[in-house]
Amino acid sequence: MSNKNFPLIFERSKEGRTSYSLPELDVESFDLEAELGSEYVRQTPPELPEVSELDIIRHYTGLSNRNYGVDSGFYPLGSCTMKYNPKINEDIARLDGFSHIHPYQDVSTVQGAMAMMFDLQESLKEITGMHEVSLQSAAGAQGEWTALMMIRAFHESRGDYGRTKVIVPDSAHGTNPASAAVAGFEAVTVKSNQEGLVDLDDLRQVVGEDTAALMLTNPNTLGLFEKDILTMAEIVHEAGGKLYYDGANLNAIMGYVRPGDMGFDAVHLNLHKTFTGPHGGGGPGSGPVGVSEELAAFLPKPLIVKKNDGYDFDENRPQSIGRVKPFYGNFGINLRAYTYIRTMGAEGLKKVSEYAVLNANYMMRQLEDVFELPYPQHCKHEFVLSGSKQKKLGVRTLDMAKRLLDFGYHPPTIYFPLNVEEGLMVEPTETESKETLDGFIDTMRTIAKEVEENPEIVQEAPHQTIVKRMDETRAARKPVLRYHP
């Protein structure tokens, strides 16, 4: 059944209709205005919809039918690792011992949850090669900021207040320079070379006595492994700086190489990406931070520790940067990640990376004759095509991304990283079959042919979606954020 004419919840409203019934008021009414003052009390009631329970159910069911997620179809959003989230994660998360507890409970009454979090810390230490891990950060960007605050605290503990700059590659995630700025640093860009990797000569030029850290993703955002990482670590460390690992692309290297073994001093992980917490809807996420022994004293407190009589919170950490989130992280996402790690095991996680890399390289080689491939070497978990060939024919990458919607696919990430013209960043992940990959490849080839033979159909896409071509510029500059009857 089509829901193209799906009404807004306000349009379902009819005065006097309700979805509830309450008994007669048997207590004294409370005069808010007299108690709080008129400036804190609405003079007119809010314009809320008046609907029945059935209206509400149909409204949200209709919205869910319009939604698109990993369970709906292929979701090759580059640098987001939109893999399938095993449903056993949800089964475990719904166990009473996890779902019916409260963070204010005495630690002695939640020893099972404490054991899980401690074991997760230990697993992440092993996976990353870090000395200690905190689960507190809520998501990736906060994990970046947390790591940078620890690096800042480390330098200041040594009286080294002149380290005011953080180096960020030109292919980095936008959150990297943003996190550096929020942490009080100046972001400095290091260029990529012709291979799409960090230019070592330029790195040597920008590193100095004012360098606090180099932020790096490896593989980088182009899906390419920074093969000179040991040299880069040496350059930064000789200058007195620290090397920070953005864990966005860990899905490509698990079981093969660890950030700690590459010389990184701090790392954040995206448990909602690599370790199958459901994401894409705005949260929650989880961004644990791991550090070397030299930085461990500065981790957010408390840490979970194992004692002879059970598990406890360690609050006695005088050099800690303090809490970065209430309680102890996003427990539900941490639990799902723990379930995934225990389900897969060490060999399973290694296979994850193998298949993620295999799928990406297969797709890249199947499409390199149709689209420009700026960096033709083997990729890791993702690759970046360029729509520059199609742009010369009057069709932009944005147009092709919208055309993909007509075929039932979520588009790849577009126009990122910024150092690729008309970029299309594709990350298939390990959970997709060859048949799914082939279907997407055929669709991309079909769209490329349309660009040559019938460009208007691509330029005016999408045609089959409930909402057609939107004016993104107007939406960004003049958003309508509330209902006006």
Curated annotation (Swiss-Prot):
Gene Ontology MF terms: glycine binding; glycine dehydrogenase (decarboxylating) activity; pyridoxal phosphate binding
Gene3D superfamilies linked to this entry: 6.20.440.10, Aspartate Aminotransferase, domain 1, Type I PLP-dependent aspartate aminotransferase-like (Major domain)
InterPro entries found in the cross-reference section: GcvPB (IPR023012), GDC-P_C (IPR049316), GDC-P_N (IPR049315), GDC_P (IPR020581), PyrdxlP-dep_Trfase (IPR015424), PyrdxlP-dep_Trfase_major (IPR015421), PyrdxlP-dep_Trfase_small (IPR015422)
UniProt record, GO biological process: glycine decarboxylation via glycine cleavage system
Record has Cell inner membrane as a keyword: no
Protein keywords: Oxidoreductase, Pyridoxal phosphate
EC number, as in UniProt: 1.4.4.2
Entry cofactors: pyridoxal 5'-phosphate
Recorded catalytic activity of this chain's protein: N(6)-[(R)-lipoyl]-L-lysyl-[glycine-cleavage complex H protein] + glycine + H(+) = N(6)-[(R)-S(8)-aminomethyldihydrolipoyl]-L-lysyl-[glycine-cleavage complex H protein] + CO2
Residues annotated with N6-(pyridoxal phosphate)lysine modification: K273
Superkingdom, natural source: Bacteria
Gene Ontology cellular component terms for the protein in this record: cytosol; glycine cleavage complex
Transmembrane intervals: none
Recorded family membership: Belongs to the GcvP family. C-terminal subunit subfamily.
PANTHER family on file: GLYCINE DEHYDROGENASE (DECARBOXYLATING), MITOCHONDRIAL, GLYCINE DEHYDROGENASE, DECARBOXYLATING
Subunit structure: The glycine cleavage system is composed of four proteins: P, T, L and H. In this organism, the P 'protein' is a heterodimer of two subunits.
Function of the protein: The glycine cleavage system catalyzes the degradation of glycine. The P protein binds the alpha-amino group of glycine through its pyridoxal phosphate cofactor; CO(2) is released and the remaining methylamine moiety is then transferred to the lipoamide cofactor of the H protein.
Protein name: Probable glycine dehydrogenase (decarboxylating) subunit 2
